From Swiss-Prot:
The lineage of its organism: Bacteria, Pseudomonadati, Pseudomonadota, Gammaproteobacteria, Enterobacterales. Pathway: Cofactor biosynthesis; iron-sulfur cluster biosynthesis. This is Cysteine desulfurase IscS. It comes from Salmonella typhi. Its cofactor is pyridoxal 5'-phosphate. The active site is at residue 328. One of its GO terms (cellular component) is L-cysteine desulfurase complex. Belongs to the class-V pyridoxal-phosphate-dependent aminotransferase family. NifS/IscS subfamily.
């Protein structure tokens, strides 16, 4: 077993060796290096064929028509294109958007930008377990609501929203529904031929493909229109201009093909490992599971260890690559906005760790992790005056701390 152990698969994944090998064939002179938009020679045709195959592989994993897949630079761009593109196109119908407080920043900050441009956004607070109350969602819908954006799987706590029911609710009212499926694609079944979802964002690097490539699903029946945000040569049916990066697209396609083949067995394996990890640490005193094991993605476990400072815990766990909060926001010292939206106090939110498991995680690594976490929590609490006071029965919430 090699240290450190990587348990941050929700931040990014290593490229699968099969994917890397495939990508290598699309870079150099002796490979397929052409521009897929070059129509006058075989270098272009071969590149275009490779892109078509990858587009099919992505569509097959999610039950879509390949013509509904638009390539982007990643899920952040897909979220921006979906939300800004739909809002701008349909703004004559209304200017009201609904989302939730626990969405990824790529959705939240896009909505903030639209607010500056005169749109009105309702931010729903989830229940304690992170799931959106559908009655609250229904109550928030208005005649001028044009778009709902609610994710499939949360990147920090792993809870799964009921996108099928939300889709039905939106379709019945003629509201466009966007789903950020970055954390769920290739891990949970998605069938867009059955789901009433209009726009869906995908990423390559969360499912063993390369970074810098993603896609946006744009429904054809009923046809959804979006306004381009990137202008140029009119690539991707006018929705996203820019030369297609064939090697990255091929990599994403291959990653999605592998995910489709291995999803069922791999998810059962990961669920087993995640449960093993939770069972190994859940009897530590003052340990709280954030999210919901039953309604959760099989590979994410978010836990708070009370009376332990999150940053010191991460340093104590230096042999584990884990995160407190998501990679996109863990550079700030603010506690996770997702956990705060669940109504958690700052102390608990600060002491949370996200373990996210993946394709190369082993049972041996999980057992090592359990052992290390137990030892580290014990050691850090031995040093903590707060823990000592808690053990003596002092109610820490009732203490008036002196401000120096």
């Amino acid at each position: 077993m090699k240290l450190p152990i990587y348990l941050d698969y929700s931040a990014t994944t290593p490229v699968d060796p099969r994917v890397a090998e495939k990508m290598m064939q699309f870079l150099t002179l002796d490979g397929t290096f052409g521009n897929p938009a070059s129509r006058s020679h075989r270098f272009g045709w071969q590149a275009e064929e490779a892109v078509d195959i990858a587009r099919n592989q992505i569509a097959e994993l999610v039950g879509a028509d390949p013509r509904e897949i638009v390539f982007t630079s990643g899920a952040t761009e897909s979220d921006n294109l979906a939300i800004k593109g739909a809002a701008n196109f349909y703004q004559k119908k209304g200017k009201h958007i609904i989302t939730s407080k626990t969405e990824h920043k790529a959705v939240l900050d896009t909505c903030r930008q639209l607010e500056r441009e005169g749109f009105e956004v309702t931010y729903l607070a989830p229940q304690r377990n992170g799931i959106i109350d559908l009655n609250e969602l229904e109550a928030a819908m208005r005649d001028d609501t044009i778009l709902v954006s609610i994710m499939h799987v949360n990147n920090e706590i792993g809870v799964v929203q009921d996108i099928a029911t939300i889709g039905e609710m939106c379709r019945a009212r003629g509201i466009i529904y966007h789903v950020d499926a970055t954390q769920s694609v290739g891990k949970l079944p998605i069938d867009l031929s059955q789901l009433k979802v209009d726009l869906m964002s995908f990423s390559g690097h969360k499912i063993y493909g390369p970074k810098g490539i993603g896609a946006l699903y744009v429904r054809r029946k009923p046809r959804i229109r979006i306004e381009a945000q990137m202008h140029g040569g009119g690539h991707e049916r006018g929705m996203r201009s820019g030369t297609l990066p064939v090697h990255q697209i091929v990599g994403m396609g291959e990653a999605y093909r592998i995910a489709k083949e291995e999803m069922e067995t791999e998810m059962a394996r990961l669920r087993g490992l995640r449960n093993r990890l939770w069972n190994g640490i859940k009897d530590i005193e003052e340990v709280y599971l954030n999210g919901d094991l039953e309604q959760g993605a099989p590979n994410i476990l978010n836990v708070s260890f009370n009376y332990v400072e999150g940053e010191s815990l991460i340093m104590a766990l230096k042999d584990l690559a884990v995160s407190s909060g998501s990679a996109c926001t863990s550079a700030t010292l603010e506690p996770s906005y997702v956990l705060r939206a669940l109504g958690m106090n700052d102390e608990l939110a600060h002491s949370s760790i996200r373990f996210s498991l993946g394709r190369f995680t082993t049972e041996e690594e999980i057992d090592y992790t359990i052992d290390l976490v137990r030892k580290s929590i014990g050691r850090l609490r031995d040093l903590s005056p707060l823990w000592e006071m808690y053990k003596q029965g002092v109610d820490l919430n009732s203490i008036e701390w002196a401000h120096h």
